[in-house]
């Protein structure tokens, strides 16, 4: 049996994810080899993600290795994967999803509402920044880059009063000690695809598609398809102020999405249900565009908006 070669970023979380998939494949009798690949996003650590604004910044180099036949499978955080894959690739599986919500971490405080006026909050996400500013315009938002350990250490050292991260990554790494609040999706709409892994292969590789098919989770595939269709309709990547949260209930997909100004002064929110996830995402996206999302996104792109300078 040929060895399956998995391509992954080298961050602690990415390696956990790749090793998790490797273990599941080994349980089914496959030999697996891990190939660590450095991406553009791993090399640029001193600039806010929104400032960089490159789609595929955490996936491009891995896809190049996949195209060249150096690896057979690419394991990604689905939220990092562009909504339209480059020519020659396909999404073989979407894994069972972790809780997709964001969380509030702090040493001293229990919630966003409990922060003192002017408190420093760390995030490099315009989506998170906008939603924080909408409920607490007095808070100061500063960029936060680096791996999970680096971000938590900066919080513990007092550089920030609080930071906002995804629950999924913290939970996978067993680092939820400073989580004070899992933020409701009504307050902090998550990123499209957050909490799920996307397993990418070369287009038409039927052997790998069959091998990986057991990893597919129906609910995760349905919800993330709706969320990513919405994001694609708006023409956004993971660095724009767009949120999407879908759930499967009674055979229907329920999708809520937001498009926001980074300063939180305007947040458009739309919810809808349907049986076809891709069509649902497109419809919600069209509604948001008709309501003014086009202007918001034009302003974001034209101003190259990013979080303030590092404190």
Curated annotation (Swiss-Prot):
Cofactor details (free text): Binds 1 dipyrromethane group covalently.
GO CC terms, sorted: cytoplasm
GO terms classed as biological process: protoporphyrinogen IX biosynthetic process
Enzyme nomenclature, EC number: 2.5.1.61
One term of GO molecular function: hydroxymethylbilane synthase activity
Stored SUPFAM superfamilies: Periplasmic binding protein-like II, Porphobilinogen deaminase (hydroxymethylbilane synthase), C-terminal domain
NCBIfam families recorded: hemC
Additional record remark: The porphobilinogen subunits are added to the dipyrromethane group.
Function of the protein: Tetrapolymerization of the monopyrrole PBG into the hydroxymethylbilane pre-uroporphyrinogen in several discrete steps.
Name of the protein described by the UniProt record: Porphobilinogen deaminase
Source species: Koribacter versatilis (strain Ellin345)
């Amino acid at each position: 049996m040929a060895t399956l070669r998995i391509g992954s970023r080298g961050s602690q979380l990415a390696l956990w994810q790749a090793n998790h998939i490797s273990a599941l494949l080994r349980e089914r009798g496959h030999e697996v080899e891990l190939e660590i690949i450095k991406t553009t996003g791993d090399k640029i650590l001193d600039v806010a993600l929104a400032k960089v604004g490159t789609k595929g910044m955490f996936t491009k180099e891995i896809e190049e290795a996949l195209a060249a036949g150096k690896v057979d499978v690419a394991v990604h955080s689905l939220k990092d994967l562009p909504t339209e894959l480059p020519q020659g690739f396909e999404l073989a599986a979407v894994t069972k999803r972790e809780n997709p919500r964001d969380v509030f971490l702090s040493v001293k405080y229990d919630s966003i509402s409990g922060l003192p006026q002017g408190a420093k909050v760390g995030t490099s996400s315009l989506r998170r920044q906008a939603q924080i500013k909408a409920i607490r315009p007095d808070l100061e938002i500063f960029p936060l880059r680096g791996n999970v350990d680096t971000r938590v250490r900066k919080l513990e050292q007092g550089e920030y009063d609080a930071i906002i991260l995804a629950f999924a990554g913290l939970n996978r790494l067993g680092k939820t000690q400073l989580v004070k609040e899992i933020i409701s999706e009504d307050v902090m709409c998550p990123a499209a695809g957050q909490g799920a892994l996307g397993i990418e292969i070369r287009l038409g590789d039927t052997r790998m598609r069959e091998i990986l098919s057991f990893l597919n989770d129906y609910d995760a595939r349905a919800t993330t398809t709706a969320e990513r269709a919405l994001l694609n309709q708006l023409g956004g990547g993971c660095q724009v102020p767009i949120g999407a949260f879908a759930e499967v209930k009674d055979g229907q997909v329920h999708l809520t999405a937001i498009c926001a100004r980074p300063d939180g002064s305007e947040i458009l929110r739309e919810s809808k249900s349907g049986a076809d996830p891709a069509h649902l995402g497109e419809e919600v996206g069209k509604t948001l565009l008709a309501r003014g999302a086009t202007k918001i996104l034009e302003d974001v792109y034209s101003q190259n908006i990013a979080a303030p300078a590092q404190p």
